[in-house]
Design a protein with these regions (language model features):
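Short, conserved micro-motifs composed of acidic
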Residues: 1-176
């Protein structure tokens, strides 16, 4: 439990027997609020399990077999929206995090160097492998203008037409 955290997220079976994600908030040294089911965009008809809150408290990762996905349990993220004061619609993390098998237990290391998760994609359903994805901090070699970036996003097709794949700006130092 993170030091100073006031809200925790956990999975528990609901009245139908499906697992859903709940939150509870610390009211004082020994009292917690009644558990609250998360909003309907996160709560699915299937099982929503293994919630993990990012260190900055703005991203909630979890595994679900009830949202549209690649098959089995997939990994999802929902971002906190200050605008609506709630979690937004979950997004499937896609490959390499999600697969047609069961993928769960998402975790980012505190130093941001690794993402760790478990999956049975290359094992039987009764065992899992733990995967660690390492991120390298690559130095930014050059910044380019929006005009230069727009030209990079153009793809020349065999019929001499161009396909514009689009450009997104980033104001972050890591270009994410």
């Amino acid at each position: 439990f993170p030091k100073g955290a006031k809200t925790i997220y956990f999975s528990a079976p609901d009245k139908s027997g499906s697992w859903s994600i709940y939150s509870t908030t610390k009211l004082n040294e020994s009292l917690w609020s009644a558990p609250q089911l998360l909003n309907e965009s996160i709560t699915s008809m299937g099982n929503d399990i293994f919630p993990y809150l990012s260190a900055d408290g703005k991203s909630l990762y979890f595994s679900s077999n009830g949202h549209f996905g690649m098959g089995g349990y997939d990994l999802y993220v929902s971002r906190w929206s200050d605008e609506i004061g709630d979690w937004d619609t979950p997004q499937n993390l896609g490959f390499p995090f999600s697969s047609p098998a069961d993928d769960f237990l998402y975790y980012d290391t505190p130093d941001g160097k690794y993402t760790i998760f478990a999956s049975n994609r290359s094992t039987g359903r009764d065992s899992v492998n733990v995967y660690a994805i390492e991120y390298e901090n690559l130095a930014l070699k050059k910044t380019i203008s929006q005009e230069e970036a727009a030209n990079i996003a153009l793809l020349n097709l065999p019929d001499n037409n161009q396909y514009d794949d689009g450009v997104e700006e980033s104001d972050k130092a890591d270009n994410s």
